[in-house]
Amino acid sequence: MSNIVWHQHSVDQADRAKLKGQNPVLLWFTGLSGAGKSTLAGALERALFDAGFHTYLLDGDNVRHGLCKDLGFSVADRDENLRRVGEVAKLMVDAGLVVLSAFISPTREERDSIRARFPEGQFIEVHVSTPLSICEQRDPKGLYVKARRGEISNFTGISSPYEAPLSAELTIDTSKGDLASQVRALIDYLTAIEVINPSRLTASA
């Protein structure tokens, strides 16, 4: 029998959420490289932050500077990268935050594994469904060019598959419409499921 037990603190998630005036959730942005995940998540965070909500954005590149700096890009390492991010996100949600996470996360199994760690309604999958052709045209980091040349192996969308969500809570193609309207759609959804109070958004406008 393990000697490691969970210590229940006197302040819980509900207490922290009440203090912050919001219902904590994890918004998981998934899609191809260049789909616009980080841009969309960043714009949503800015809108929420400016309205006084407590947020944090976990970005695929940023976590590899510290939390996951010891990991490469093998299948095993990518799985471990997402496992760690999922655990950190869970702690942040427990702290009462609205957490935004922008990762390719190419397999349904990976995403479903993270979803399973959260109570019903706290994991919101946002499929950034921008087509491969558009992502490849954008290619902000030059990664698609390298992948086509064979310089990058197991590159999602080129030499490694991306499994689109079957039942994402939201689907947004960033090649259609403008960023402001896409953020508005996200905010409308969060308002509808009572994650945020719309009156605070009105007051900050």
From Swiss-Prot:
ATP binds at residues 31-38. Keywords: ATP-binding, Kinase, Nucleotide-binding, Phosphoprotein, Transferase. GO terms for molecular function: adenylylsulfate kinase activity; ATP binding. It comes from the Bacteria. The keyword Phosphoprotein applies. The active site is at residue 105. CDD domains: APSK (cd02027). Pathway: Sulfur metabolism; hydrogen sulfide biosynthesis; sulfite from sulfate: step 2/3. Disulfide bonds: none annotated. Its EC number is 2.7.1.25. InterPro entries: APS_kinase, P-loop_NTPase. It catalyses: adenosine 5'-phosphosulfate + ATP = 3'-phosphoadenylyl sulfate + ADP + H(+). Pfam families: APS_kinase. GO terms for biological process: hydrogen sulfide biosynthetic process; sulfate assimilation. Catalyzes the synthesis of activated sulfate. Belongs to the APS kinase family. NCBIfam families: apsK, PRK03846.1. This is Adenylyl-sulfate kinase. The gene is cysC.
